[in-house]
């Protein structure tokens, strides 16, 4: 898997903005990515030093469309902790 396919998009919310003050940033990642791949992708894309990577899987939900039940897509997130002094400028000013 290409390292630029690992990181899908940054997830920006109120909770994630509070975590950014503690040098923790949240990204949506590819389903097949592991911690090593996420660490390499963040370090190469943003030129920072990653201390820790926590990953979680959010399963899809069942929704109704008329009489039919439809399964929404699941989501995989990574919470990335950076070394003190490093920042990802993508999250600043949000």
Swiss-Prot record:
Biological processes, Gene Ontology terms: translation
Quaternary structure note: Part of the 50S ribosomal subunit. Contacts protein L29, and trigger factor when it is bound to the ribosome.
Gene Ontology molecular-function annotations: rRNA binding; structural constituent of ribosome
GO CC terms in record: ribonucleoprotein complex; ribosome
Originating organism: Dehalococcoides mccartyi (strain ATCC BAA-2266 / KCTC 15142 / 195) (Dehalococcoides ethenogenes (strain 195))
Annotated InterPro entries: Nucleotide-bd_a/b_plait_sf, Ribosomal_uL23-like, Ribosomal_uL23/eL15/eS24_sf, Ribosomal_uL23_CS
Function, in words: One of the early assembly proteins it binds 23S rRNA. One of the proteins that surrounds the polypeptide exit tunnel on the outside of the ribosome. Forms the main docking site for trigger factor binding to the ribosome.
Keyword Secreted annotated: no
Family, per entry: Belongs to the universal ribosomal protein uL23 family.
Protein name: Large ribosomal subunit protein uL23
Keyword vocabulary terms for this entry: Ribonucleoprotein, Ribosomal protein, RNA-binding, rRNA-binding
NCBIfam families, alphabetized: PRK05738.2-4
Gene: rplW
